[in-house]
Amino acid sequence: MEAHFVAAAAHSAAFGDRVGGESPYLSHIVLSERCMVNFGVPTFLLASGNNFYAEVQIRFHGCLQCTQWRRVFSVYAPSSAIDRILLPDVSSGNCGRSAPFRIMYDSGNSWGGLFISVPVFCDPEKLTFDGYTAVAVRLAICGSADEFYEMLFTYDELAQPQTRFYADAGRFDALALQICEYHIPAAWPSRRKEEFLNLRGRLLELIAARGSTRQLDKVLRADSYITHEQPLVPDPPKEDEAASEAKKKEADDAMKKLKDAAAKVASSDANRQREPGDREQGVSAALLSTCSGMPGDHHAPQHAAVAGAVKAVASGLNSIVRGLSAAGGAAATSASQLADIRYTDALLAGLEPPGRNRGEPRPQRRVPDLESVVMDDGQSRHDRVIPASGLGGARAPASVEECLKALCAIISDPGTPPQSAWTFGPISIVTHSCYNSGSPILIVTYSDGGRRAYPPIVSGITALSEALLAAGASFPSDLNEDEKAELLRKAPCFARPMAADEAREYQKLFSVDSEQVFLFGLQARVTTAMITALTVAVARATDQAADNLLLNQIVSYDLAVRDDDDLPGGRGQRDRLAVAQYDGDRAAGHWPAKLASQAADLIAWFCVNLQTESFATFARSGVWKAILTSLVAEDTLHRLPFLAPFHSDPAIYMFDYFRFGAGNMSRVTGDPNVIRFKPALRTGLMDCEFISGAASPAHPWAVHKFLPGQFHSYLCVGLNSELEGLLIFPGGFGLRFDLGETLDEVWDKNLDRAVLDRYSRLANISGGPPRADRGADCAIADVGCAYPYLKSAPRAPSDFSTTSTSGHESVTILY
């Protein structure tokens, strides 16, 4: 919760309560440990006290444009992630005891997770967001420039307007019962003990009064919040298995209220003097109230609703009663409104619909009064406690929540930060599945000053699905002009992808894997160019007459050969040996000749390996980083590759190592070895040396041992900033190839900007003279051309940063 609270504070300082256009909505999420592991993140490094930080980039759907990388506040909980959300933190003042609050977990939902907040851009008119827009999250671990991991999500995974506040109904009762069992430490002073006992007595009175109307349970269960632990399956679970205890209690209370409401309507109609026809309509209204769960008013049902009336639809019967009762004299809600197809999925899934008027979006405050919490005067906690009786005649706490907050303040040490206001308000936790792994992702919505704060945003995918269903089309391009115009009226967020002609060549539009397809396309282009370059090099080095591949020694090494008499030139001719050419006919008994006969097969294995690698592996390779270095060198702006070795010297190569043997080949290096070449004493040969830094703190065992050609079963591939390549076999033999020449044939210059925005940063973002558009410090400054409603950069907020001494938290600069 700390990460979410600080992110909301900075966001509120920058944008206030505005939502839409240049002011993004902030979605608070928790990425489960299993989700991060499936993306290749070593979570054990996050939990072992290593420093790390997180960065976020928004990649807009249909235009290949994206925001700048921005560091966000992040906290990692190694286990029991929802403890950080639902339970007050009183560990500092608990005198080494176990915490008074606890949640019951099972083996499937006790996982940890990463707490971050993501900006969600939506149009200012309808507040719709494009669910296909991608969100890239990068984690840099151990402060190492090369130790980073990237995760890709979509807005549809990380931002949802539905909530589950109802599942939090019994949390305060459970926490109150748990704190009543707290044993007072003997070291407490008498005044502190007295205040605690007085407040606990008052709390017991309030609990007793509340328990007279419903059954209270002191067990807080994680499965009430985390609704699934495994990937979602097509068949929904049975209702008796999916329903939680809180929902059952709510249904019982709601049924009682429904019966009371129906009886009141029937009694009123019976006592009212009416004509016979009107009396029949009154009886019908009462029957409708009792049978359908929709209480009517005291008059005959009216089917004409006032335009713009709020649709009082909710997930529970209790919510329906409260919503319709609050309407008072407003127009009656018709049955068709309750059966609105756009809410069906949310209701069946146990979610609450968007809490706003669907006709005219009204942004709501989503965070509490941050000033009263952030601008704390540091006064002792115990001086602010209101005792239950005696002591100055102060007003006793009137609710369980007030008592609970005061008791937590007493347990905490004096001078510690105050409890977050979010902890003592309703909290919604919605579980979604990651598209790539099926692992759970939590979307958290906090209350607004104790009131439920429903997200004002709406997913444009809902309007898109309705338009396609009504037209009988399977793709947005199949819609006619009128249907497209109606879709854009309901969901302006699709204005750019609907008109995307240029991006259609590189992206799979209106697809959850749109960004992945774009990245795979980049990998395919580079792989094709690499294979072509190697094919050209092999063709040039092949003796057409003898049909043998001739390998020259490139790196200067002394070769140990058993029989010098069989060597070309005889004994004492090692300099000539070093530059000699070997084929299958000359010196057939020596390993250089055997290597020459196997070289073509090894190159073929290497090409197959390139084609089958994942993009995550490819993005860390020396081949891709050399291409980035080349693009950065050609760009007019001063840029640095993101967390990649950057060397513009053409004598410096980034090498990937592949080990061969037993009929296969596998990559050895994760990040490339950076090696400098220089002329050797022997004419025509090269010497080389490592210039990489020390081994990564994350992997201290990864010590550089072998230069290219030193190990008997390593095939080494290196590229410099000019995309000149070296393919080095054991012994220093190899081929030279030109990747830049073949890459130009398959690379589109329109891709340069998209690649640089994703894999580099402007050199003067951190330090240096400020740019003229310093307002671009906001995350959305560079997306003015991405959507019509982002026309200019917003005002720049003051830098909001915080430093934490915990190894699980990061120093941050927020949106």
UniProtKB/Swiss-Prot annotation:
**Where found?**
Virion; Host nucleus
Q: Which UniProt keywords apply?
A: Capsid protein, Host nucleus, Late protein, Viral genome packaging, Viral release from host cell, Virion
Q: Is Ligase given among the entry's keywords?
A: no
Positions of the region Disordered? 227-280, 795-815
Q: Where is the composition biased (Polar residues)?
A: 799-809
GO annotation (BP), single: chromosome organization
The source's superkingdom equals: Viruses
Extent of Basic and acidic residues compositional bias? 236-262, 271-280
This chain's function reads: Capsid vertex-specific component that plays a role during viral DNA encapsidation, assuring correct genome cleavage and presumably stabilizing capsids that contain full-length viral genomes.
Q: How does it assemble?
A: Interacts (via C-terminus) with capsid vertex component 2/CVC2.
The entry's protein name is Capsid vertex component 1
